[in-house]
Regions:
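Outer membrane beta-barrel strand-and-loop segments of large Gram-negative receptors
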Residues: 264, 352-358, 396-398, 402-404, ...
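Extracytoplasmic beta-strand/coil segments of soluble accessory domains associated
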Residues: 75-92, 108, 112-153, 172
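Outer-membrane beta-barrel domain signature, strongest for Gram-negative TonB-dependent receptors
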Residues: 257-378, 512
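Short acidic/polar hinge/loop motifs at secondary-structure boundaries
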Residues: 150-178
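Surface-exposed extracellular loop regions of Gram-negative outer-membrane beta-barrel proteins
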Residues: 287, 293-298, 380-384, 394, ...
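C-terminal beta-signal and adjacent terminal beta-strands/loops
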Residues: 458, 650-696
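Periplasmic-side early beta-strands and strand-to-turn transitions of outer-membrane beta-barrels
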Residues: 182-183, 195, 203-204, 212, ...
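Gram-negative outer-membrane beta-barrel transporters
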Residues: 410-417, 518-522, 540-634
Length: 696
């Protein structure tokens, strides 16, 4: 067996309960290298510090101090700007500097930096993403936003990660909320919210050109141009394209070639001192490589498709903001989003229209009140290609109408605040839903924060839950037996009641620590109801069908904690990371027996995750960055524990040029991160690429 945690041959056995030897060797190797590097540079850095300070690095390379990091304003937790210190939620901010120095080439890769997130690459262009458990390829209990636009698909209540893209250089920050956010964001914000926020156009004047390529990320090209008309209107336009090769396939199928091209624009217009208008949009077209297995009623009974299929879409978003006074403001936002997917098993065409209004006012006594209303309509068209996979009806319009009210009460000014609120929604699947929460914040000093929260959130049913008809071959002959999974109109919303506690502190301005502890109780989770067996004559030939209806058959509990320290002992070195612990237990509700989903849910999330990121800023404008990740075993996905490391060397010879070399997954030739629905598991390969960026 090779040094990989993933066997080269399918017949090789994996031990899911012991750490991979290469992971242990990797920890030792990284630790040794870090120690040698520290001993080497310690004697040189003090002498070099004056020279470094005189080189005036460009603005976008300057680092926030840890104190400034705590004062960064975020909006995802309450829809209003508030400092991280005063946010009563488990929030983590991935900054533009974090993104640039991670060496990541996709948004999903960047999310690995956040504590509590489970990000596993299943092949070249698919990911399984989750927060505090229940991770999967479609992230069904997670809400993802791009500049306030939800990228949730009502077909399966999840996210197509391979089409969520923009210029990574244009992302200002990514705000990650671990824990329920249904009161503010509504349906699907059950386990967490990821809010991707791009830069204002006033921060992207000039031109940017970026080119890169390597053995897996074979070619990446990006261009962006921005400017102003001098009368309050700022703009940017961009284009990008890439081709990514396949990962490691034991059978040599190499089906996951990935290509995408994308164009986009944004304008921000200060109409006057009170009004701001934003208009932005994107268009994309690509090839999404995957393996699909389809069961048939006639020989050969099962057909496997390898290779890319067409995906495309676009969106247009408008936002108007008015500041009535220092104590009140209003925002109205609307967007249109179109998605087209032409895959071997079925086609999906979807148009989504969304509008919402948010009003904020600070009343006498310092209370901050938020009121909002919104609506979303999402008509689709599903084209059936095989009798064994269908959604009935083929055309459906998903609709959600919502309102929410939130009041932040300052019990002790600048010390203790209580936030009460609730979301009220009506959808065409489960009817009326209410999602309340209560949050308490205590800041005894300017460098300490305690918070606690109790929240109810729901995941409303999707088309898959109520309309799916999927038939899978179990036995090809004597007799021919099929398993049929069917949606149910009785499927109702999954429910969560979450309790959280948190603590943040800044110690001596050099060490920042963020701790969050949680306990979540789930009810009415996705599972299978009572099965039936019958003989079916049509379509011919006659065959046996074992039919399972989808039902709210399971309950579950998750408990755990995340700790994320950030240490900056000197100006030129930052060391940060996180440790995440999760215990997940899913079991049948009374009257149900669903061993398939209980085993899958209980064994598909890691108990332990570790991330360590070291950022060195050398003299002569060199940067050396290393990230180590450890993920414990996923028995249900046939994945052993693994550790891997990414390394980046960057150089800024002049402020307008940046050159970098990145190595990814360096500790083994390839390793598995998540299971496969079809045949063999894909191994994620060791890779490297070079990149050059020019800014003007």
């Amino acid at each position: 067996m090779s040094g990989s945690c993933f066997p080269n041959r399918p017949s090789e056995e994996i031990d899911f309960h012991r750490p991979c030897r290469s992971s242990i060797r990797g920890i030792t190797t990284v630790s040794t290298l870090a120690l040698l590097l520290w001993l080497t540079v310690t004697g040189q850095m003090t002498r070099a510090q004056v020279a470094q300070n005189n080189q005036n690095p460009p603005e976008n390379l300057k680092h926030l101090s840890l104190e400034q990091l705590g004062n960064v304003e975020v909006t995802t937790a309450s829809k209003e700007p508030e400092q991280i210190w005063r946010t009563p939620a488990a929030i983590y901010v991935i900054t533009q500097n974090d993104i640039r120095r991670s060496g990541a080439t996709s948004i999903a890769e960047v999310l690995r930096l956040a504590p509590g997130l489970e990000v596993a690459r299943t092949d070249s262009d698919h990911w399984a993403v989750g927060v505090r458990g229940f991770g999967g390829q479609f992230s069904k209990s997670l809400l993802v936003l791009v500049d306030g636009r939800s990228v949730y698909s009502p077909l399966f209540a999840g996210v197509y990660w391979q089409v969520q893209d923009t210029l990574l250089e244009d992302i200002e920050r990514i705000e990650v909320i671990r824990g329920p956010g249904g009161t503010i964001w509504g349906a699907n914000a059950v386990n967490g919210v990821i809010d991707i926020i791009t830069k204002s156009t006033k921060d992207t004047h000039g031109m940017l050109v970026s080119l890169g390529g390597g053995n897996v990320d074979q070619g990446i090209g990006e261009v962006r141009m921005g400017g102003t008309n001098g009368k309050g209107l700022d703009y940017r336009v961009y284009g990008k394209g890439f081709i990514r090769g396949p990962e490691f396939h034991p059978d040599g199928s190499n089906f996951d070639l990935w290509k995408t091209g994308q164009l986009g624009f944004r304008t921000d217009w200060n109409l006057n001192t009170r009004d701001m208008l934003t208009l932005q949009g994107d268009l994309y077209q690509g090839l999404d490589g995957e393996r699909v297995a389809i069961s048939l009623y006639t020989p050969p009974s099962r057909q496997v498709f390898n290779g890319p299929h067409d995906v495309g879409g676009g969106n247009l978003l408008g936002r108007w903001q008015r500041q009535f006074s220092k104590d009140s403001d209003i925002q109205i936002q609307g967007y249109f989003d179109r998605t087209t997917r032409y895959s071997p098993q079925l086609d999906e065409i979807r148009n989504t229209f969304d509008i919402d209004l948010l009003y904020h006012v600070t009343v006498k006594g310092g209370q901050s009140v938020l009121v909002g209303i919104g609506g979303r309509w999402s008509p689709d068209a599903i084209v059936q290609k095989f009798a064994t996979l269908d959604f009935q009806p083929h055309n459906e319009t998903d609709s959600i109408y919502s309102g929410f009210l939130q009041d932040q009460i300052n019990l002790v000014p600048d010390k203790v605040a209580l936030t009460l609120g609730s979301k009220f929604e009506h959808n065409n699947y489960s009817g009326f839903e209410i999602q309340p929460n209560a949050r308490l914040l205590w800041t005894p000093t300017s460098h300490q924060t305690f918070w606690a929260a109790v929240t109810r959130a729901v995941r409303t049913p999707s088309r898959l839950d109520q309309d799916l008809q999927l038939t899978l071959l179990l036995q090809p002959a004597n007799p021919t037996i099929y398993l049929r999974v069917v949606g149910s109109k009785k499927f109702s919303s999954e429910q969560l009641l979450g309790t959280e506690f948190g603590y943040r502190t800044l110690i001596a301005k050099k060490l920042y620590v963020d701790l969050a502890v949680f306990q979540n109780a789930y009810d009415d989770l996705y599972g299978y109801g009572q099965g039936t067996i019958f003989v079916e004559n049509s379509p011919p030939p006659p065959h046996v069908v074992f039919q399972l209806p989808l039902a709210n058959a399971l309950k579950g509990d998750t408990t755990g904690f995340e700790i994320a320290p950030n240490w900056k002992p000197v100006e030129w070195w930052e060391l940060k990371g996180s440790y995440s612990f999760l215990h997940l237990y899913v079991h049948d509700k009374a009257g149900f027996t669903d061993n398939l989903n209980t085993v899958s849910d209980n064994g598909s999330s890691p108990h332990h995750q570790v991330v360590i990121q070291s950022l060195f800023s050398f003299p002569k404008k060199f940067e050396f960055d290393a990230t180590y990740r450890y993920v414990s075993a996923l028995p249900a996905q046939l994945v052993s524990a693994y550790g891997t490391a990414d390394v980046r060397l960057g150089w800024h010879p002049v402020p307008s040029w940046e050159l970098s070399i990145v190595g990814q997954n360096l500790l083994q030739p390839h390793h598995a991160e998540f299971g496969s629905d079809v045949d063999t598991i894909v191994g994620i390969k060791r890779s490297a690429y070079a990149k050059i960026v020019w800014r003007r």
